[in-house]
Regions:
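Cytochrome P450 catalytic domain signature, combining two hallmark sequence patches
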Residues: 6-11, 128-140
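Conserved catalytic core of nucleic-acid polymerases
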Residues: 6-8, 28, 69, 148-269, ...
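A common structural junction motif
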Residues: 291-300
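Conserved "right-hand" nucleotidyltransferase catalytic core of DNA-directed polymerases
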Residues: 1-93, 105-110, 117-120, 180, ...
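Feature marking long nucleic-acid-engaging regions of large polymerase/nuclease enzymes
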Residues: 97, 107-114, 123, 133
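Short active-site loop/helix that positions an aromatic residue
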Residues: 1-4, 117-132, 147
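Short, contiguous acidic/charged loop-to-helix segments that flank catalytic cores in large enzymes
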Residues: 26, 50-56, 87-89, 97, ...
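Hydrophobic (often cysteine-bearing) scaffold residues that line and stabilize catalytic clefts
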Residues: 120, 139, 143, 241, ...
Length: 320
């Protein structure tokens, strides 16, 4: 702070938060990025060690724990290890971290990864049920559409904006997306976006009003506990995605068993599933992925069709 740094994130007691993510964004102090790299290099071996600690010595595999209803939104949570915290391939040393998650039968099997396409925005489209917006998701460029509706000039900013908005970001956070510290700028962006999507404005108001009771209703009728009204929309959208993905998984497993395929589920992370698949069954599994998610759309009576993509490879680094 003596070098001119002003903290943006504080603890509940008012102390500045100084971690890897904060340090990596400080451009005017050369030492900051070096410290951030040091913290990263210290963290990665610790993560890898935690994976090795839970390897089953009999099977040679990691049998992680999945708690299917632990999260408020209905998402699955993970431990021993936390598979949701394995670094992504685009992260520093992320590719190397994901390459260690592989099949032990590379001559006959592959890792088959599939994930739901644009899940959050499709769930948003389901709830606001605006044909033009749904059409843009399915056939156009929804991020350019959002960019224009919010009055932004950069498509990448629009992507950051919409997901921040759905996660309950306020005017201050929204303003920071376009490099402003003025809350009024963020409020103007939000107001313009909502004025372009009146059904979203109405949906948001209804959800936040319902959240005053501490509960909101999910896609399948279940009740979600919410701590604050501004997080309620995120809980509804994320919860809908979690419900849909579980139905999708159930459908996939049903078809795998019916066809008698050599397929094993090896990881489930939010809207993504990783399987170990016999090379002879890759085409059939690809067809199942598409069929199962189409069935999910119909079973849940969704206003916006779901879709999925898949990749195959010898490691997780190649499939997601």
């Amino acid at each position: 702070m003596k070098l001119g740094w002003k903290p943006n994130k504080l603890t509940d007691k008012g102390s500045p938060i100084v971690d890897e993510s904060v340090l990596s964004k400080i451009d005017n102090i050369a030492e900051a990025k070096l410290i951030a790299e040091y913290l990263l290099l210290k963290k990665r071996p610790s993560q890898i060690s935690s994976w090795l600690d839970v390897v089953n010595q009999t099977t040679g595999r990691v049998h992680g724990r999945v708690l299917t209803l632990r999260c408020v939104s209905g998402r699955m949570s993970h431990h021993s290890p936390n598979m949701a915290q394995i670094p992504a391939t685009y992260s520093p040393y992320g590719k190397e971290c994901r390459e260690v998650w592989t099949t032990d039968k590379p001559d006959t099997h592959v890792i088959f990864g599939t994930d739901a396409s644009g899940l959050e925005l499709r769930m948003l489209a389901h709830y606001i049920n605006t044909p033009e917006y749904t059409h843009e998701i399915l056939n156009g460029d929804i991020h350019t559409k959002n960019m224009n509706m919010a009055g932004l000039s950069d498509r990448d900013q629009a992507k950051t904006f919409i997901y921040a908005f759905l996660f309950g970001a306020g005017a201050k956070k929204i303003a920071q997306i376009i490099g402003s510290k003025d809350m009024a700028v963020g409020k103007k962006l939000i107001d313009k976006f909502l004025s372009e999507l009146p059904r979203l404005k109405s949906f948001r108001s209804q959800v936040e009003e319902a959240a005053q009771s501490g509960k909101v209703k999910g896609l399948d009728g279940r009740l979600f506990n919410v701590r604050s009204a501004h997080k309620a929309v995120n809980t509804i959208i994320q919860g809908a995605g979690a419900i849909a993905c579980k139905v999708w998984l159930r459908n996939m497993i049903k078809h795998v068993r019916t066809k008698g395929l050599d397929v094993k589920l090896v990881a489930s992370i939010h809207d993504e599933y990783q399987f170990e698949v016999n090379k002879n069954d890759i085409q059939s599994m690809g067809e199942i992925v598409k069929l199962a998610i189409k069935e999910t759309t119909e079973q849940l009576n969704l206003n916006c069709p779901l879709d999925a993509e898949y990749k195959t490879g010898l490691s997780w680094a190649e499939t997601h």
